[in-house]
Amino acid sequence: MEHLERCAWVLRGTLVRSAVRKYLPWALAASMLAGSLLKELSPLPESYLSNKRNVLNVYFVKVAWAWTFCLLLPFIALTNYHLTGKAGLVLRRLSTLLVGTAIWYVCTAIFSNIEHYTGSCYQSPALEGERKEHQSKQQCHGEGGFWHGFDISGHSFLLTFCALMIVEEMAVLHEVKTDRNHCLHAAITTLVVALGFLTFIWVWMFLCTAVYFHNLSQKVFGTLFGLLGWYGTYGCWYLKSFSPGLPPQSSSLNLKQDTYKK
């Protein structure tokens, strides 16, 4: 438990900082552009991470929203209940996960439709011999063909959105104080470590996507959708009263923020 607490302490000192929430979106956008330029101008040699079957891609990135959802669910519930003691407020804050699920579902559906309506089936990856009889990606692949359309990077979208959402929710740790004897201490500490490492995986795999996969425009649109999903919720809607709201803050901190705004 002592090692876990040390990890949690380090993660609190990094991911929970307001500077991280402020600059991470810009860092992701900049690294996506830099990685994409590197891919176009001086491609890196193939490696384990450039293989789509690598462990991180198969068991984490492919189900990134499931990991994010399953770890944020108990984290939001425990930290918000610890601070407020109000079940209604906890349920309201948990609805952020429903909103996130809706954003994930709608965006991936949009990407799939764009790839469908802009694509065609070919006999080879070199786009030779168009097979007009196959009108869908599933049918094309089923017949051994290769579908080529505008494939917006789902990884760039989802990894951006998940990383930013986790960092936003971990801001509550500024207010959460538990000692070793507290009944929630072990659970919250474990979740902090798990979410911290998950965030680093998302950022690392986002960088791998930038330097190994998709073209620049596909990654630009994917990252843009992720940033819009984050900013539209945490930057706009969640500031309103008719929303799931932001992570709870102490009255003293709110007073300081109100004074600063004035």
Curated annotation (Swiss-Prot):
Catalytic activity: an acyl-CoA + H2O = an acyl-4'-phosphopantetheine + adenosine 3',5'-bisphosphate + 2 H(+); (9Z)-octadecenoyl-CoA + H2O = S-(9Z-octadecenoyl)-4'-phosphopantetheine + adenosine 3',5'-bisphosphate + 2 H(+); (5Z,8Z,11Z,14Z)-eicosatetraenoyl-CoA + H2O = S-(5Z,8Z,11Z,14Z-eicosatetraenoyl)-4'-phosphopantetheine + adenosine 3',5'-bisphosphate + 2 H(+); hexadecanoyl-CoA + H2O = S-hexadecanoyl-4'-phosphopantetheine + adenosine 3',5'-bisphosphate + 2 H(+)
Lumenal face of the membrane: 45-57, 115-145, 212-218
Entry keyword annotation includes Amino-acid biosynthesis: no
Cytoplasmic side: 1-23, 79-93, 167-190, 240-262
Keyword terms, alphabetized: Endoplasmic reticulum, Hydrolase, Lipid metabolism, Membrane, Transmembrane, Transmembrane helix
Compartments it resides in: Endoplasmic reticulum membrane
Domain of life: Eukaryota
One Gene Ontology cellular component: endoplasmic reticulum membrane
Single GO biological process annotation from the record: phospholipid biosynthetic process
Residues annotated as catalytic: H155, H214
GO MF terms, alphabetically ordered: coenzyme A diphosphatase activity; diacylglycerol binding; triglyceride binding
Transmembrane feature ranges: 24-44, 58-78, 94-114, 146-166, 191-211, 219-239
EC number: 3.6.1.-
Pfam families per record: FIT
Topological category with respect to the lipid bilayer: Multi-pass membrane protein
InterPro entries: FIT (IPR019388), FITM1/2 (IPR046401)
Role noted for this protein: Fatty acyl-coenzyme A (CoA) diphosphatase that hydrolyzes fatty acyl-CoA to yield acyl-4'-phosphopantetheine and adenosine 3',5'-bisphosphate. Preferentially hydrolyzes unsaturated long-chain acyl-CoA substrates such as oleoyl-CoA/(9Z)-octadecenoyl-CoA and arachidonoyl-CoA/(5Z,8Z,11Z,14Z)-eicosatetraenoyl-CoA in the endoplasmic reticulum (ER) lumen. This catalytic activity is required for maintaining ER structure and for lipid droplets (LDs) biogenesis, which are lipid storage organelles involved in maintaining lipid and energy homeostasis.
Similarity annotation: Belongs to the FIT family. FIT2 subfamily.
Official protein name in the record: Acyl-coenzyme A diphosphatase FITM2
Taxonomic lineage from the root: Eukaryota, Metazoa, Chordata, Craniata, Vertebrata
